[in-house]
Design a protein with these regions (language model features):
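Short, low-complexity patches enriched in S/T/P/G
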Residues: 1, 23-24
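Positively charged n-region of N-terminal signal peptides that target proteins for export
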Residues: 1-9
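C-terminal motif of bacterial Sec signal peptides marking the signal peptidase cleavage site
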Residues: 16-19
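A residue-level marker of the well-folded mature domains of exported/periplasmic proteins
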Residues: 24-30, 34-419
Length: 419
């Protein structure tokens, strides 16, 4: 009888040890502390905190790979956030905005991911489909518009007030234009800026309008021409867009597209350039001024932290320049106008404390008129019907009623040369 009891006790102990070992394989362990700092006798394996925390395994879906500056910004943030939190992760790159996105999400679920993030606007319907099919998994989507109306508890949208960064980039551009005017390189009425947009979506319009308002804040005589590539990433079309704008007399260029096509063309033609998503100083040392980007690491850390703690993730999350979700690269002093760093610091402080509003309706007109009211299509039901009043207190309230931009207005001073 005693022998039988001893055998049973041994089996129970073995099973207990196996259970502890299993929980450690599901949750990547933090770097082990030196033996002298954590003696085994003082911290038994069965009492390790890692065994008590829910395991998070993250899966990420990217439209392109590291060659796209847009996707590289997300990839770097994903790695940073996961490594900071000690989260195991899988990356899927080159996933088109189609059924392939759903397939990639389903594969990540099969591989044990309970947090899945996709980075491109067109991924949304397919990621939402996956969220409905796998309710035990949390799905987060950058730049999307449907979470706040879809009513799917495990589906979430996120964005950041990148228009603040675009405005700062515009300020840097305006300073450069003023320098060119003062030096006699151009006259005040030749202060024409070019902008290469991917698509004529609200996200892109919000970006180039905020950039232009930053330019005008410093250089009141500036005008801007916009051309579209109808692709998020096409080095050839982006280069051709830059060539077209330069041939039309644009003396400074910016973009909302994802390759080095335009920056390299600007460098070849000695045209100053404000970039997006990362620095181009190494490739374009003579013309790159500065760039803005969304820092996605804070959101990813927040969302994965919610999964780990079993807490709800915000349906619509918006980061700001004050929360370091919007960042500027280092200024390239070789190309920037003198005093750019000091001016950007001054304007950044004003944006953070709210004394300066990017979309202050007193700073722009539409067909010669100041806007006092405007209905925007915030509740994206697929019908493109505006329903939400977005002007209040003399400001177009961007990214307040949902995280993704909905500024889709054509303001005076900007010309779409493709129209």
């Amino acid at each position: 009888m005693k022998k039988t009891i001893s055998i049973l006790l041994a089996l129970v102990l073995c099973l207990g040890l196996m259970a502890c070992g299993g929980s450690k394989t599901e949750t990547p362990a933090a770097p082990a502390a030196p033996a002298a700092e954590a003696p085994a006798a003082e911290a038994p394996a069965a009492e390790a905190p890692a065994a008590e925390a829910p395991a998070v395994k993250a899966g990420f879906i990217f439209l392109h790979d590291e060659n796209s500056t847009y996707d590289l910004n997300f990839i770097n943030a994903a790695k940073e956030a996961c490594e900071k939190l000690g989260v195991e992760y899988l990356l899927k790159t080159g996933i088109p905005e189609g059924q392939e996105c759903y397939d990639a999400a389903a594969e990540l679920v099969d591989e044990g991911c309970n947090f899945i993030f996709a980075d491109s606007f067109g991924h949304e319907p397919f990621l939402l489909q996956a969220a409905k099919e796998f309710p035990e998994v949390q799905f987060c989507h950058a730049t999307g518009t449907q979470a706040h109306t879809a009513g799917v508890a495990n589906y979430h949208n996120a964005f950041a007030s990148i228009y603040e960064g675009r405005f700062l980039g515009g300020v840097a551009a305006g300073l450069k234009l003023n320098q060119m005017i003062e030096e006699g390189t151009i006259t005040a009425d030749q202060a024409k800026v070019g902008y290469i947009g991917a698509f004529p979506y609200a996200e892109v319009k919000s970006g180039y309008t905020s950039f232009f308002l930053g330019v005008r804040y410093i250089c009141p005589t500036a005008t801007m021409e916009v051309t579209f590539t109808n692709s998020w990433y096409d080095p050839t079309l982006e280069k051709e867009g830059a060539t077209k704008l330069i041939s039309r007399g644009c003396v400074l260029i910016s973009e909302h597209a994802d390759s080095m096509g335009a920056p390299t063309e600007c460098e070849a033609n000695n045209i100053p350039f404000v970039f997006y998503n990362g620095s181009a100083a190494d490739a374009c040392p003579n013309t790159f001024i500065v760039a803005s980007r969304i820092n996605w690491a804070p959101y990813m850390e927040y969302a994965m932290g919610c999964v780990a703690k079993g807490e709800a993730i915000d349906v619509d999350w918006t980061g700001t320049i004050a929360t370091e979700s919007v960042l500027m690269t280092e200024i390239n002093e070789q190309a920037a106008a003198p005093g750019t760093a000091e001016k950007l610091a001054e304007i950044k402080a004003m944006l953070e404390n709210g004394s300066l509003k990017v979309f202050d309706t007193a700073t722009f007109t539409v067909n010669g008129q100041t806007l006092t009211e405007y209905l925007a299509d915030v509740d994206d039901m697929g019908d493109f019907q505006p329903e939400t009043q977005v002007i209040a207190d003399g400001e177009f309230q961007e990214s307040i009623f949902r995280s993704a931009p909905y500024f889709d207005i054509d303001i005076d001073g900007i010309t779409n040369i493709d129209a």
